[in-house]
Regions:
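Active-site environment of non-heme Fe oxygenases that use a 2-His-1-carboxylate facial triad
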Residues: 1-8, 20, 61-217, 223, ...
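N-terminal auxiliary "cap/dimerization" subdomain that precedes the catalytic jelly-roll/cupin core
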Residues: 1-55, 60-61, 218, 223
Length: 260
């Protein structure tokens, strides 16, 4: 949908974003703010949509919003979002404890890359339904309290965290929450046949050509507002000489966009 200025939505623009998120758990907007490097775009947009609890991860900027661009000092420490490498399917904050679950996030594109940097997105509710309809035991396995463990991060003192064990699917105030990563390193799945089968089936959904997967490449001034949907990012190539070095603002929240 078109918006005049994400920092100052009209009532009808805000209502439409909420409405679409209520249907699909995600909404994509376009604005005239191509190339405008102002993190208030993400901050004010979130506030107007009722997102009040910004969650700053250790690598976020001082104001709690992350500037996702190729950053050597962060990429050297192994943090893929700050490289031009592909990001595998995941939900944000899958390594967080339950009290810090990421309910929503905003991505706002200041500048695209010269090539690449596409996102694919899938509503977790659709993923749940596909798994349930294929075999209810898949959902049962992924809802177990010990379905997935993210080992402790003890290598980087600035982003140290303990191991986190929990379900893939959980409910929070009547809404579905999903924590997932397609990474095969730094993750431990519950060692039983049901969990392995469920993870394999979900992997096939994400690797296939599902009509439920939405694909887009954000242009300058465009953005995504969503209730922490599954997403990935393809590798990309920057060309600073032509001004095409990818910069995306990311704001994460522990609350969700609700259809008021």
């Amino acid at each position: 949908m078109e918006v005049r200025d994400p920092r100052n939505l009209s009532d009808s623009e805000a209502a439409e974003i909420r409405r679409v998120c209520g249907i699909a758990n995600m909404a994509v907007y376009s604005s005239p703010l191509a190339g405008v490097a102002d993190k208030n775009i993400a901050r004010r947009l979130g506030a107007q949509l009722g997102l009040a609890h910004l969650h700053a991860n250790p690598l976020a900027d001082e104001d709690g919003i992350s500037s996702l661009e190729v950053t050597p000092q962060k990429s050297a420490r192994g943090y893929i979002p700050y490289t031009n490498r592909r990001l595998l399917w995941h939900t944000d904050g899958y390594y967080n404890p339950p009290q810090q679950r990421i309910g929503a996030f905003i991505l706002h594109c200041v500048r695209p890359a010269a090539a690449g940097g596409e996102n694919r997105l899938l509503d977790p509710e659709i993923a749940y339904i596909l798994l349930r309809d294929a075999d209810p035991e898949y959902v049962k396995a992924l809802s177990a309290r010990d379905a997935m463990t993210i080992p402790a991060n003890e290598e980087d003192a600035a982003a140290a965290r303990p191991a986190q064990t929990g379900p893939v699917f959980a409910t929070d105030a009547g809404t579905l929450h999903m924590r997932y990563t397609a990474r095969t390193r730094s993750i431990e799945w519950r060692q039983n046949e049901a969990t392995r089968a469920a993870v394999d089936f979900l992997g096939r959904i994400l690797a296939g050509d599902s009509p439920h997967v939405f694909q887009l490449r954000l242009s300058a001034g465009q953005g995504i507002v969503c209730n922490n949907v599954l997403h990935d990012r393809s590798a990309f190539t920057d060309d600073p000489a032509s001004g095409l070095n990818r910069l995306v603002y990311r704001a994460r929240y522990t609350d969700r966009v609700v259809n008021a």
